């Protein structure tokens, strides 16, 4: 299922960009994605739009195919990608729920999962995280 609207694709797909070195001028944009739904990651590093990927992840908002316009936006604006495992996503989701008291879907927990999985990478850095997405079925929680 491919989406055509770039704005819709960015929101719904939630590549979950976050900026390291928050401050505007000296920032790095990192795409965060599930390891088992890494079509944007593979597309970014190969500079080729990967369309034959079959994402399998609890982050159901990230199961759709990367759109053409979104791929173009990624190539122009993202500096790198980091992926998170399913267990890292679940742990991040639990932390957001329990400590921030914010109900988010698994897709929205991916950026935090990446940060928590690479503490040495983000040590002593100012990090901004975008949390969005509360489309969640309480009967289908991953724990």
Identify the residue ranges that each predicted region occupies:
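Active-site-adjacent helical/loop segments in soluble small-molecule enzymes
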Residues: 67-124
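Short Gly/Thr/Asp-enriched flexible loops that form oxyanion-binding sites at enzyme active sites
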Residues: 12-22, 27
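Glycine-rich beta-alpha junction loops
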Residues: 8-9, 33-38, 55-58, 66, ...
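Single conserved hydrophobic/aromatic residue that forms the stacking wall/gate
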Residues: 1-7, 11
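Short, well-ordered secondary-structure micro-motifs
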Residues: 13-16, 40-47, 94-95, 139-141
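Anionic-ligand binding region
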Residues: 39-62
């Amino acid at each position: 299922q491919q989406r055509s609207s770039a704005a819709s694709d960015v929101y719904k797909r939630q590549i979950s960009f976050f900026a390291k070195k928050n401050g505007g001028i000296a920032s790095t944009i990192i795409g965060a994605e599930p390891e088992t739904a890494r079509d944007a990651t593979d597309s970014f590093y190969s500079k080729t739009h990967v369309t034959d990927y079959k994402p399998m992840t609890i982050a159901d908002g990230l199961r759709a195919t990367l759109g053409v316009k979104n791929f173009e936006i990624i190539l122009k604006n993202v500096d790198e990608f980091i992926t998170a495992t399913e267990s890292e996503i679940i742990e991040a989701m639990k932390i957001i729920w329990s400590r921030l008291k914010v109900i988010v879907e698994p897709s929205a927990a991916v950026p935090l999962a990446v940060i928590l999985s690479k503490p040495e990478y983000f040590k002593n850095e100012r990090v901004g995280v975008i949390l969005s997405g509360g489309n969640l079925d309480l009967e289908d929680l991953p724990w």
